[in-house]
């Protein structure tokens, strides 16, 4: 499906190495302090940071809270570079991170973007001119600006444990942004940002399924969680320059997810030859390419072999990767998604069938 002809063939040793990057290996590369209790995944240290964040959000604590500093400290025992940032930008330090949303270990379509926005808050706003509490009150002065959606997320439940869970799932969770916004819309909310900006064609093609009152939210989610959202840079900024981005432990985790999922496909296709191949759609492809290449070099120990690195990346590009037609195109559609040429309606429909009514 949608593959281009390629003369590159992967060595069996490379395929085996991709398969070795299994769930257990991926969990060790998770920078958020993942702890497994049976089959349940927990993030106790991240939850402690979120609880601290909520105290600052309520204005109950003096001092300065910084997401970037908290995340760098959380991941201090993991090899790699810390998250870089642009000085004391309030967006970097106060804005709630968004990184991984969706069933990232089993997804079929991965929407890979650069970072989450700020809803109009300029990167020039500094922490020495604005407290975290004041930052989250920006929507009270201008309803069209600032983190209104995060305030709604925090106020959604009364219990602290529920608030912590909701915030954590915004940072890393198994429910996709398409699912979250679609379920909210089914329950009377306005259409969400990602559905309006990125998923109009998907919604249009699946209206009868998504908005059928006889279909449960859970059944909708089983389909729509096949779409996974990965941000390269977990912190927020209004503009890419305001991020001060460099490859770091968190961006590499996103790249390792991609390598893991491709390895899982190679492992599964041996016994299930007709399974759908995962596809990865990239915006800011230049930055993503550099990060994936860094992950390949790290994992395969290809530091001194650029030819092997390029050969593997080219194979992944030809067989698994898609781009948007321009830097400004972000909508996941038959017009905007390209594999050297636009993929067209038939191929787009085949790729996104996993998001549709399974009864059809």
Give short role names for the model-derived ranges.
Residues 84-216, 304-310:
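Adenosine ribonucleotide-centric catalytic and binding domains
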Residues 2-51, 57, 243-259, 286-360:
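C-terminal capping/extension of enzyme domains
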Residues 118-123, 236-241, 288-294:
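Short catalytic/ligand-binding loop motif for oxyanion handling, primarily in non-cytosolic enzymes
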Residues 2-98, 106, 121-148, 301-303, ...:
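Non-catalytic accessory regions outside enzyme or core folds
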Residues 110-112, 228-230, 281, 322:
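Hydrophobic/aromatic beta-strand patches that form the interior of the parallel beta-sheet core
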Residues 183-273, 277-279:
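Hydrophobic, aromatic-enriched interface-forming segments
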